[in-house]
Amino acid sequence: MAEKVNNFPPLPKFIPLKPCFYQDFEADIPPQHVSMTKRLYYLWMLNSVTLAVNLVGCLAWLIGGGGATNFGLAFLWLILFTPCSYVCWFRPIYKAFKTDSSFSFMAFFFTFMAQLVISIIQAVGIPGWGVCGWIATISFFGTNIGSAVVMLIPTVMFTVMAVFSFIALSMVHKFYRGSGGSFSKAQEEWTTGAWKNPHVQQAAQNAAMGAAQGAMNQPQTQYSATPNYTYSNEM
């Protein structure tokens, strides 16, 4: 088997750094979970884009007469939350679907609930916190309408992010409970060390992939279009 080379994030060649993670949905994730895993990845991308747009909104806020603190904090949130959200909640759910690990699911639930709370706070928009939320944006319309309109864009995006985060958390939790997962299973994995054993993880991944492939390749009973009658010679 060829050695997997880290490919994420895809950095330009002139940057003297190498990717930190290996990510391949089709190779790592069982087919029945690829769609949900990709949706969570797109949600992480939306969160990153929203933080970048928020930086622009805070710049407009600064130009319109707002304080420089918001712009500085917005820049800090962008460079801090973008990699942290990937490591803290996307990688655990990626690993959870890859290896069917209850411990990874629990790690995702814990960190993603924090992500949901942060998204709600960002959508609310407390002035001085470096986010263009509803309170900050609406209150700034009386100061500079042009800047407030620009601030309205990340405000809407933060709101959408909060709604999508709640939906995603509900979907993953429903799937996890429906598949028989529980907190006791996560505790068992922690106690036995199965969550960090690469051989156990590979075995779980192979079992999940094999089950999915077997379900897709299961032969279907075929029926002949021509009826076959059996006649008895006894009258």
Curated annotation (Swiss-Prot):
Keywords: Cell membrane, Cytoplasmic vesicle, Endosome, Exocytosis, Golgi apparatus, Membrane, Protein transport, Synapse, Transmembrane, Transmembrane helix, Transport
Gene Ontology biological process terms, A to Z: exocytosis; negative regulation of endocytosis; positive regulation of calcium ion-dependent exocytosis; positive regulation of cytokine production; protein transport; response to endoplasmic reticulum stress
Stretches of the chain forming a coiled coil according to its record: none
Induction (UniProt): By endoplasmic reticulum stress.
Transmembrane segments: 40-60, 68-88, 103-125, 149-169
Residues in compartment: Extracellular: 61-67, 126-148
Membrane topology (UniProt): Multi-pass membrane protein
Protein's job: Required for the calcium-dependent exocytosis of signal sequence-containing cytokines such as CCL5. Probably acts in cooperation with the SNARE machinery. May play a role in accumulation of expanded polyglutamine (polyQ) protein huntingtin (HTT) in case of endoplasmic reticulum stress by inhibiting the endocytosis pathway.
Name this polypeptide is given: Secretory carrier-associated membrane protein 5
Species this chain originates from: Homo sapiens (Human)
Originating gene: SCAMP5
